[in-house]
Curated annotation (Swiss-Prot):
Keyword Acyltransferase among record annotations: yes
An annotated Gene Ontology molecular function: N-acetyltransferase activity
Family as reported in the entry's similarity comment: Belongs to the UPF0039 (ElaA) family.
Function in brief: Could catalyze the transfer of an acetyl group from acetyl coenzyme A (AcCoA) to an acceptor substrate and release both CoA and the acetylated product.
Lineage: Bacteria, Bacillati, Bacillota, Bacilli, Bacillales
Name the UniProt record assigns to this protein: Putative acetyltransferase BSU40680
Gene giving rise to this polypeptide: yybD
Keyword Ribosomal protein applies: no
Keywords: Acyltransferase, Transferase
Pfam families for the chain: Acetyltransf_10
Species: Bacillus subtilis (strain 168)
SUPFAM superfamilies tied to this protein: Acyl-CoA N-acyltransferases (Nat) (SSF55729)
Amino acid sequence: MNVKKITSEQDLHTAFEIRKAVFVEEQGCPISDEFDEFDTLHGDCQHILAYHQNVPVGTARVRIVGHTGKLERICILKSYRKFGLGKVIVDALERIVKEQGISAFKLHGQTQAAGFYEKLGYRTASEEFMLDGIPHVLMTKQDDSAL
């Protein structure tokens, strides 16, 4: 398993296909809500692809909001879950943020995945709320050891 930063339009398109498969087709999110102004190669987000045996099976993005790294659109194709790739993705996103001298992180995690994020040091920081018909919570993490 490995992760790489997306640097080509082809890889960005691959990431979009993974997001479409997970969020739109599997979870029923409206496609109009899945893609936004941050989905560009040279914008404010850094996108990544996660690979299992050289096959792209997961993706995510991260952007800096204020003095916090906001982890977004974390997803893995269904048949590749439960192999530790989620931790690999989150670790990679956190490294990207730390490279910019920032040690605070946040994400809107699906409530059913909150336990996973808690194991990685995140804490629930909000009441449950709905995004695209799916329950979410705000989760935050401070990692001062990174600086």
